[in-house]
């Protein structure tokens, strides 16, 4: 039990954050945040305040921090332009179900919505925050601050782990009152247990399935459910398809693990599909089109909306992914028919197609050889990056971090800084393009200032490469895709960051190994030319048409009745 103490709203914010165990904060300070930042200063070693050079990096860094560690990432910005600068990172965290707490300053509480032209005023700021959070709240008095933070953390630790936001006007932060902190409850983890009748019905479907398939999404990672996923897959002898944001939820060394290319060949034959922690949507079409008309579905998700149209109707288990998978593993009998041969045939068929995408495949292989098994790859939108989502082998959860369906250019480098801040003893490598790196190259200063242990690999082709590919295929010509780049080695040197240049996969591998061995921040420029598209393999056939691979169905004979 706590007792009321006389303090400012800024002090209350800092002390409640400390009580919640939220130590690391990514922030660009400003006048509306002065009392909050000073409250943090008073707490000394209770906090680590990391200051990037642009507010965009505050939310990206908090996202990377959260996704790598599973802990809550915290970013803090001034209102108006500070918030809008952070929106790209917030929208990415929302798309990728990242547990992020956004703290935003506000103009004087008496003038909100009045349109007086106050410093950093923005019309409808609360609505803007609401568009990229699952919950948000506003404090209008200092004594509301601890309860608002407590509610935000409760929301973050229950349900789908998307961002939440709180707004605190600067007069609320600077005003003093008798304020009581709100201790977190002991032993509460917020996990939703499955209903027994839902588990029984799903287990019966799976037990009688001729060929069950598991489609695992990012909710498996969020729930730390990898072990439970493997156990159920082994009992059912069911292949596990992972999505871009869930890769690593099951090790690629596991005999039941398949990437999405092999998965599309398998799922068309499934009579029962268990969808776990996934939106199960095609990014470029209104509904998934991968299964047969007779396929039955089980949706295991903490949100009921995950089973709603346009998805096909099915049985819903509304529960935490780990608890649901554990319950199913206890309820289903062990499969009598091994299916590893079927899975291996699909994997080989997919690997053959992936190997044909060069030179990207050679670069992906070089990355995997250079990065330790438990190292992190932060993957941005480059031609090498696109192929990496299906071709880069993963052995541990959370070790591939992507922008998900938001597809945010400029995501990679600042997000990797957050990963490095969260996991200082693990290798962190970001791959980005010369286009995307331009969004945040000033954060080389942040990497140097905090000695963050990471390498940014910049693939330099002098263009917005994917835009060029799309324009050329669609129109037969290009416009607005050429870039005027700096000398990246001189740029790195100006910030006091080591650099190297490579022009081949082997050179890149050697330079990357050296950079990782040295530790600290490094920039590695890889000079490349135009590359073919890999989009036909990652599900965007409506954009990039390619002939169907042969055989068109690699497992039909193995699954014949």
What does each model-identified segment do?
Residues 1-4, 143, 179-181, 293-381, ...:
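Phosphate/pyrophosphate-binding active-site segments
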Residues 2-332, 370-373, 453-456, 492, ...:
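N-terminal alpha/beta PP-like core and its mobile active-site loop of ThDP/TPP-dependent enzymes
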Residues 10-14, 18-23, 31-41, 343-425:
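Active-site diphosphate/adenylate-binding microenvironment
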Residues 30, 223, 264, 319-322, ...:
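Conserved structured core elements
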Residues 131-138, 185, 343-357, 495:
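Short glycine/proline- and acidic residue-enriched helix-loop micro-motifs
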Residues 170-172, 383, 528:
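Active-site-proximal loop/turn and secondary-structure-junction residues that shape catalytic pockets
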């Amino acid at each position: 039990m706590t007792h009321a103490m006389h303090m400012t709203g800024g002090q209350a914010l800092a002390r409640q954050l400390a009580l919640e165990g939220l130590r690391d904060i990514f922030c660009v300070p400003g006048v509306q945040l002065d009392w909050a930042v000073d409250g943090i200063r008073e707490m000394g070693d209770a906090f680590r305040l990391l200051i990037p050079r642009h507010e965009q990096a505050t939310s990206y860094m908090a996202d990377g921090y959260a996704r790598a560690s599973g802990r809550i990432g915290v970013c803090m910005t001034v209102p108006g332009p500070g918030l809008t600068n952070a929106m790209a990172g917030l929208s990415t965290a929302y798309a990728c179900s990242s547990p992020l707490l956004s703290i935003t300053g506000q103009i004087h509480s008496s003038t909100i919505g009045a349109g007086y032209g106050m410093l950093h005023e923005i019309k409808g700021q609360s609505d803007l925050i609401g568009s990229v959070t699952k919950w948000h709240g506003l404090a209008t008095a200092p004594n509301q601050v601890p309860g608002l933070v407590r509610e935000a953390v409760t929301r973050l630790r229950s349900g789908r782990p998307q961002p939440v936001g709180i707004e605190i006007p600067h007069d609320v932060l600077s005003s003093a009152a008798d304020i009581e902190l709100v201790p977190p409850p002991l032993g509460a983890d917020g996990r939703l247990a499955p209903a027994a009748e839902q588990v029984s019905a799903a287990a019966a479907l799976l037990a009688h399935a001729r060929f069950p398939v598991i489609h695992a999404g990012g909710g498996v990672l969020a729930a730390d459910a990898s072990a439970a996923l493997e156990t159920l897959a082994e009992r059912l002898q069911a292949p596990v398809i992972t999505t871009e944001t869930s890769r690593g939820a099951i090790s690629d060394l596991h005999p039941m693990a398949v990437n999405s290319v092999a998965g599309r060949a398998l799922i068309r034959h499934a009579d029962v599909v268990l969808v776990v922690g996934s939106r199960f949507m095609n990014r470029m079409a209104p509904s998934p089109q991968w299964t047969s008309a007779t396929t039955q579905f089980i949706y295991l998700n903490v949100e009921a909306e995950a089973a709603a149209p346009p998805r096909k109707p099915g049985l819903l288990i509304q529960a935490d992914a780990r608890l649901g998978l554990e319950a199913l593993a206890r309820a289903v009998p062990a499969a009598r028919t091994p299916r590893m041969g079927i899975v291996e045939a699909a994997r080989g068929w997919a690997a053959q197609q992936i190997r044909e995408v060069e030179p990207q495949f050679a670069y992906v292989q070089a990355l995997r050889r250079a990065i330790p098994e438990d190292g992190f790859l932060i993957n941005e939108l480059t031609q090498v990056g696109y192929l990496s989502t299906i071709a880069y082998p993963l052995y541990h959860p959370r070790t591939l971090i992507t922008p998900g369906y938001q597809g945010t250019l400029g995501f990679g480098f600042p997000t990797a800084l957050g990963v490095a801040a969260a996991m200082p003893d693990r290798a962190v490598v970001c791959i980005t393009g010369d286009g995307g790196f331009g969004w945040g190259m000033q954060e080389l200063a942040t990497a140097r200032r905090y000695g963050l242990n990471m390498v940014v690999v910049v693939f330099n082709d002098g263009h917005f490469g994917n835009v060029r590919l799309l324009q050329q295929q669609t129109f037969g010509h290009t416009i607005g895709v050429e870039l005027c780049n700096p000398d990246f080695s001189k740029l790195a040197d100006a910030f006091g960051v080591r650099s190297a240049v490579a022009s081949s996969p082997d050179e890149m591998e050697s330079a990357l190994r050296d950079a990782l061995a040295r530790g600290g921040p490094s920039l590695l420029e890889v000079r490349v030319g135009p590359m073919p598209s890999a989009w036909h393999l990652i599900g965007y056939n409506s954009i990039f048409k390619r002939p169907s691979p042969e055989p068109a169905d690699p497992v039909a004979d193995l699954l014949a009745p």
